[in-house]
C-alpha cells in the first residue's frame, strides 16, 4: 500500500562472455513516470562515471526518435524497435534519396515533377498522376493521388523512423537486439534473489538507497560466479595444474582464516589492556 515505485536498470553485456554482465545504473522513480523520460538521465549518469556504452538495447518506449537523436550526441547508438506500424507495403525508406535526403525517385523509378518545402520544413514531392495511375503497385504506395496531382510528404523525423522500421526487418538487427532479453533475467534476479519488490523502507530517498544496495549485492554475486567459472575453465584446460591450484587455494584460505583469528585476538587484547587509548589509536 502507499506510493508505488519503479526501478530503472542498465547493465553491461558481452557477446563473447569475456566479462561478467554488471549493473551500471540504478534509479528509482514514482510508478507513474514514463519510461521514455528515463533514458537520457541514465546516459548522463553513466557518462559522468566514464561507463558510457557504445550501443544501448532498449524496448520501444525508450527508443523514441527524440531519445535516439539525443543519445547519438552522447556517442551512444540506441537499438530499439520503433513505435507503431508501417501503414503501407512500400515505405518512405524504399524511395531513392540524395546524400542530403532529397527524394530522387520512387521505388519503380519515376522521378518527381517538382519538390516544395512545407510550412514546418518538410518536403512535399509531386509526381505525374497519370504515371502513378498506371503503376501496378499503387495500392501499396504511400503516394496520395488526388485530382490533378500525386504527392507524398515527409520530414527528417518521418524518414528516420521509416529507415529504422526497414532496418528492423534485417537479420543484423535481430542478431543485435536479441541480447536485450538479458535485462529481463536481471530484473528477475533482483526480484527472486535480492527481494527488491519487498523493501522494508518507505520514502523515495530510502528506497533509492535500498535499490542501489540490492543491485550492488547482485553485482557481487555475479562477479563471484564469473570468477568461479573462470577458475573451473582454467582447471579444465590445465589438468596438470589443477592439483597445484587446489593446494594453493586451500593454503590461501587457511592463511586468511588464521590472519582473521589473529586480528580478532589482537583486538580483544587491545580493548582489554589499552581501552582508554583505543579510540585515539584508531584515529591515528
Predicted features, each with a name:
Residues 1-284:
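Anion-binding and metal-coordination hotspots
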Amino acid at each position: 500500500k502507499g506510493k508505488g515505485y519503479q526501478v530503472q536498470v542498465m547493465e553491461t553485456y558481452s557477446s563473447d562472455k569475456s566479462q561478467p554482465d554488471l549493473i551500471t545504473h540504478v534509479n528509482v522513480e514514482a510508478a507513474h513516470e514514463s519510461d521514455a523520460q528515463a533514458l537520457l538521465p541514465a546516459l548522463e549518469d553513466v557518462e559522468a562515471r566514464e561507463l558510457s556504452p557504445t550501443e544501448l538495447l532498449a524496448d520501444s518506449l525508450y527508443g523514441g526518435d527524440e531519445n535516439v537523436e539525443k543519445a547519438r550526441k552522447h556517442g551512444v547508438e540506441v537499438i530499439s524497435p520503433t513505435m507503431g506500424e508501417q501503414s503501407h507495403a512500400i515505405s518512405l525508406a524504399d524511395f531513392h534519396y540524395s546524400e542530403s535526403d532529397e527524394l530522387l525517385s520512387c521505388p519503380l523509378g519515376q522521378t518527381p515533377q517538382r519538390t516544395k518545402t512545407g510550412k514546418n520544413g518538410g518536403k512535399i514531392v509531386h509526381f505525374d498522376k497519370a504515371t502513378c495511375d498506371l503503376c501496378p503497385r499503387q495500392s501499396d504506395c504511400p503516394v496520395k493521388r488526388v485530382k490533378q496531382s500525386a504527392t507524398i510528404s515527409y520530414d527528417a523525423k518521418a524518414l528516420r523512423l521509416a529507415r529504422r522500421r526497414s532496418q528492423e526487418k534485417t537479420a543484423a538487427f535481430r542478431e543485435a537486439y536479441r541480447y536485450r532479453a538479458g535485462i529481463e533475467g536481471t530484473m528477475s534476479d533482483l526480484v527472486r534473489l535480492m527481494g527488491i519488490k519487498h523493501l522494508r523502507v518507505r520514502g523515495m530517498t530510502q528506497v533509492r538507497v535500498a535499490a542501489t544496495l540490492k543491485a550492488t549485492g547482485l553485482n557481487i554475486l555475479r562477479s563471484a560466479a564469473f570468477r568461479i567459472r573462470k577458475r573451473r575453465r582454467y582447471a579444465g584446460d590445465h589438468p596438470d595444474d589443477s592439483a597445484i591450484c587446489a593446494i594453493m587455494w586451500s593454503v590461501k584460505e587457511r592463511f586468511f582464516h588464521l590472519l582473521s583469528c589473529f586480528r580478532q585476538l589482537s583486538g580483544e587484547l587491545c580493548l582489554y589492556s589499552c581501552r582508554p587509548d583505543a579510540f585515539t589509536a584508531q584515529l591515528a
